[in-house]
Amino acid sequence: QYDFDEVIERRGTGALKYEALLPRWGRDDLIPLWVADMDFRTPPFIMEAIRRRCEHEILGYTVKPRPFFEAIRDWVDRRHGWKVNASEIGFAPGIVPGISSAIQCFTEPGDKIMIQPPVYHPFAMIIRENGREIVNNPLILENGRYRMDFNHMKEAVRGCRMFILCNPHNPGGRVWSPEELRRVAEICTANGTLVVSDEIHADLTLPGHRHTVFATVSEQARMNSVTYMAPSKTFNVPGLGSSYVICQNPDLFAKYQDFVSGRELAEGHVFAYDGLISAYSGPEGEEWLAQALDYIQENIRFIDAELRRRMPKIKAIMPDASYLVFLDCR
């Protein structure tokens, strides 16, 4: 039904991964593999929702409509079995801005924040930019898969006010198991360390694997976490700037909402809501995603086979989730 083979020219449209090639690397004829967005056409049902909104011809100030919350509530229930209330959902202009807000809201300058390298590099960037201290709990690469080092974590987490979890992991592709996540919850709760879980790649969990939302693994996890999600990676719409935060601890969520509201970060632009609602509501989004995941999985298999045939010394870290394939070139 959808043509994922179609090649669309993105140069000249302000696309980050193409337009930044020349100023960053001095040439623009490179294949950009440094930004995590797909080159698939934006799904037609999302484009149609945006066109309908444009037909009104007044792009004024916009409040979050009730269907925005309902669409998120129903989506995370259908996709991940996570029961949430609309009152536990908030808007975020992006995952990184959202996590940066959490850092500012729940920690103080000089506080320690733990991350698990190799991991999405903006985590370290926003910790430093907010004047906090990075504490590393490195993952262990074992038999082509990353695993957490819990013995090291128990020591590293001491004195940390926050742990930024990448679930599923970027770039390692791990879908963390419920058992692993429960251990994280136990260790962090025992040390008074808030877990901020970046779950933007959750919907891109590949066939044969199942994503587990951190907040669902235990009461400790539910009450000691803030979760960020978005349709941006799922449906290739990062330019919409439509992400969201879910927190089921009323006190934490009230503090966070007061913080972002006071900095005018709690509202989105006119297309952010309609884009998300169209992606998450109705069967079109589910069907598009199912077809996209099948296509992505075949691409990953192709990469692995070609590396084995052409460059056998380079090992692909085969992902459980996402379209990112981390290559071990050592």
Residue ranges, per PLM feature:
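Walker B catalytic acidic pair
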Residues: 199
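Active-site PLP attachment segment
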Residues: 217-255
